[in-house]
């Protein structure tokens, strides 16, 4: 496997820490050891997160093309767009963000706080659009890029989650290589890796990276899209493309892509009672915060799978904390009493 041939622009602090979740493990019976890899602490750029790791491989391409404006898209409380805005500010580039109405959640301050507030503070041109949730290529995003061209700028396209970008899976191939180096220091290997999936390139990169040592199907995606068939297809397609890019040496099969669909409800961006319980439990036992859109759902999935006995006794499970906490303030009614 050859990830090193791709240029990488450093935006992160370095390898993200792996933290034992001792109290949560004990609370759940102590038969499974839980750990978290803290991608939410990976950068000084506006709280970082998983997209910052991905953007390290997109930035060299943007610079080589002579782009002057990063153009991205997401929901109103998109973590992706906040991280793109931070990278643009860091590079001295302009930034245009299309923020669609992906979540059926009404709150008078939803579009004024959290991620979107931070993006505005960093100077991004934020454009609110009424279109609903979709993980594919969007006309509103293409129109934003054309508007930059018409104004004499040179846009660089960054799709939702970086996922439809040809280089979008590379960052989390690197994640897997990083975990292997940390496992060598820890003296053990993780039996499972739990990760939230929506647009797909995070899990796709992990699948490719862990396929190198036979653990592709030990990457357990927890769907948060509530459109699991499309998400599974997108993960698989991105993984196959990424495997070719890095010369994995074997094809990615549908069996390599494991996506648990039980925890996405009631729909994208809205938590169910189990997700809210998981968010509060993790916060109160570990002081680790998760959000109701993404990480709360993957935390719910991991906790439930432990309780159901779906991880063998003695298993070591790594939870990939991808970020997302800045969105919590947009759900202030949900968490008004903690």
From Swiss-Prot:
Its EC number is 3.5.99.7. Pfam families: PALP. The modification N6-(pyridoxal phosphate)lysine is found at residue 51. Its cofactor is pyridoxal 5'-phosphate. Coiled coil: none annotated. GO terms for biological process: 1-aminocyclopropane-1-carboxylate metabolic process; amine catabolic process. The active site is at 78 (nucleophile). Keywords: Hydrolase, Pyridoxal phosphate. It catalyses: 1-aminocyclopropane-1-carboxylate + H2O = 2-oxobutanoate + NH4(+). It comes from the Bacteria. GO terms for molecular function: 1-aminocyclopropane-1-carboxylate deaminase activity; D-cysteine desulfhydrase activity; pyridoxal phosphate binding. Homotrimer. Belongs to the ACC deaminase/D-cysteine desulfhydrase family. Catalyzes a cyclopropane ring-opening reaction, the irreversible conversion of 1-aminocyclopropane-1-carboxylate (ACC) to ammonia and alpha-ketobutyrate. Allows growth on ACC as a nitrogen source. This is 1-aminocyclopropane-1-carboxylate deaminase. The lineage of its organism: Bacteria, Pseudomonadati, Pseudomonadota, Betaproteobacteria, Burkholderiales. The gene is acdS.
